């Protein structure tokens, strides 16, 4: 729960879901859907209804404890920030919200962008055009740093003569999403190697 100001100056407690949705929409518009909303300032909020301990250099805080159990929270540091990257997925590939959202966006975009391809004649040119359109989209996402890479292909084992005769054509694609730097570790090493540079 979060506190915000009412028009009359009083404070109102509200659930954070609308603020988080707004933060995600703002992040999508300003940075891209592939960025994590974690560590971003939530606007229009005075403070969390229940303070959560947090320090940038202390892993043993309430905020980090909650994050270990896939619970995002809010912390106070130069504003009220959403703190937490993780989903409740049991499959570790989908543990980060930004990775899940990237996959969803790619899948939805491909379906919408290929409405033109439904009910077209399945020819070699058709298969090549669809494959190249998907690959062009994946290259564009890579150029934007939305993904690290990806590729589309038509698998001949699935696209049998019978499948094509039944009006089915299969396009596989893969991609790698960038993962958020949830834990940054700086390791300090005191050495005498640079003493020689004094003279």
Predicted segments with their positions:
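Short, surface-exposed charged micro-motifs
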Residues: 65, 72-74, 151, 161, ...
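Helix N-cap and loop-to-helix transition residues
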Residues: 58-59, 123, 160
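Generic alpha-helical propensity signal that fires on short helical segments
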Residues: 36-42, 51-53, 124, 170-172, ...
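A glycine- and small-residue-enriched flexible loop/hinge signal that marks low-structured segments
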Residues: 1-112, 155
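A generic structural signal for short, non-catalytic loop/turn and secondary-structure boundary residues
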Residues: 68, 145-147, 164-166
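C-terminal edge-of-domain segments
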Residues: 159-199
């Amino acid at each position: 729960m979060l506190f915000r100001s009412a028009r009359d100056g009083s404070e109102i407690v509200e659930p954070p879901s609308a603020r988080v949705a707004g933060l995600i929409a703002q992040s999508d518009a300003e940075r891209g859907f592939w960025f994590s909303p974690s560590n971003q300032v939530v606007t229009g909020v005075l403070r969390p209804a229940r303070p959560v301990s947090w320090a940038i250099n202390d892993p043993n805080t309430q905020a980090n404890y909650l994050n270990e159990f896939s619970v995002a929270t809010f912390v106070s540091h130069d504003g009220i920030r959403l703190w937490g990257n993780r989903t409740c997925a049991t499959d570790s590939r989908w543990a980060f919200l930004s990775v899940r959202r990237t996959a969803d966006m790619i899948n939805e975009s491909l379906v919408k962008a290929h409405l033109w391809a439904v009910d077209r004649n399945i020819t070699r040119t058709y298969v090549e055009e669809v494959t190249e359109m998907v690959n062009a989209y994946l290259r564009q996402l890579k150029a934007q740093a939305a993904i690290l890479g990806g590729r589309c292909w038509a698998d001949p084992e699935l696209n049998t003569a019978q499948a094509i005769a039944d009006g089915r054509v299969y396009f596989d694609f893969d991609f790698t999403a960038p993962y958020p730097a949830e834990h940054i570790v700086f390791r300090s090493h005191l050495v005498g190697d640079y003493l020689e540079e004094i003279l």
